[in-house]
């Protein structure tokens, strides 16, 4: 009963995408969302905050790990690389930076807007251990997290090659869906697509 109730709560929350005051209003707000340690919105700040949290863990001799997710368009921000340089210098092996590498940002293809490639080599230059994976493959994601846990003396960057809008037929590889909600008809199609994708995952 608990599991069913929880699933219903999650589903109810999903329909509040972009509604002001909801969990999914847009950018996460630490005052309203349990488990969120930092309000965000401005591009480039997440990695810096994560580096600070990881450094605090080292200074306080705490045994925790910090995971941060950033976009491949977002790493065009210089602040990301300042943070990466410091993290590598301090050998923050409790830090994992995951780059969502779908090659699309709000303005189009990232390699045409301002190419950050090769992403893995750039992180390696700042003393990161890098892992390149298929970011739509859960087995590869799990394996990368395990590898990151075993890595000592340097932070880890996981370059997750993904498909934007994966699983929703009309959203896949479409930059236009970067920040808008579907209409009622599109919502119904998307839910059917995702239910099929979910069933396929459960059969693996």
Show which residues each predicted segment covers:
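Single conserved hydrophobic/aromatic residue that forms the stacking wall/gate
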Residues: 1-10
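General structural signal for secondary-structure boundaries
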Residues: 11-13, 183-184
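A glycine-rich, hydrophobic loop/mini-helix early in the fold
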Residues: 14-23
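Glycine-rich ThDP/TPP pyrophosphate-binding loop and its adjacent helix/strand module
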Residues: 23-204
